[in-house]
UniProtKB/Swiss-Prot annotation:
A biological-process GO annotation: translation
InterPro entries per UniProt: Ribosomal_eL18, Ribosomal_eL18/eL18-A/B/_CS, Ribosomal_uL15/eL18, Ribosomal_uL15/eL18_sf
Family: Belongs to the eukaryotic ribosomal protein eL18 family.
Gene Ontology cellular component terms for the protein in this record: cytosolic large ribosomal subunit
Domain of life assignment: Eukaryota
Compartments where found: Cytoplasm
UniProt name for this protein: Large ribosomal subunit protein eL18
One function term, GO molecular function aspect: structural constituent of ribosome
Family annotation (Pfam families): Ribosomal_L18
Record keywords: Cytoplasm, Ribonucleoprotein, Ribosomal protein
Entry keyword annotation includes Ribosomal protein: yes
Species, as recorded: Anopheles gambiae
Amino acid sequence: MGIDINHKWDRKVRRTRPKSLDVYLSLLVKLYRFLYRRTKKKFNKIVMRRLFMSRTNHPPMSLNRVAHLMKLRGKDEKSVAVVIGTVTNDVRMMDVPKLNVCALRVTDKARQRILKNGGKIYTFDQLALLSPTGRNTVLMQGKRTAREVFKHFGRAPGVPHSNTRPYVQSKGRKFEKARGRRSSCGYKN
């Protein structure tokens, strides 16, 4: 009689390469894998690992957030903000300070505003030449839980102290807004 072996721990479930077939992304991974191996700097390891991640884990960041975090860190104009994701424009921001940004993508409007105010935009291969160990850089990322789908996660909708959004087919007064919420439909709490 055979032994029932538990294969639960056999494989490590984590990405070792990007799932995307984008050749430029795989070249960046190759570059940062080399840099991490040669420099042993945590910055290169984090950049490499974030390049593997799925698109949902590359959340976008607004110009306002980038500028705020740079100001918060008290960084000078030589420092580079590093975002492994997209940098987007923020129309609520009147004046954009001088920023040096390195990102996978920068939207057209954000690019215009950064360059207009004397800032610079680097690609990750340019950053590797400029700062191979991550000196004078500020690594930042957008909020991963900002996606609409996260509003549906958590305690079941309807139970006490739950702020979770229900998945509803209809939004009329006779549906989620009815029983327990109006006296004409059973009761009202």
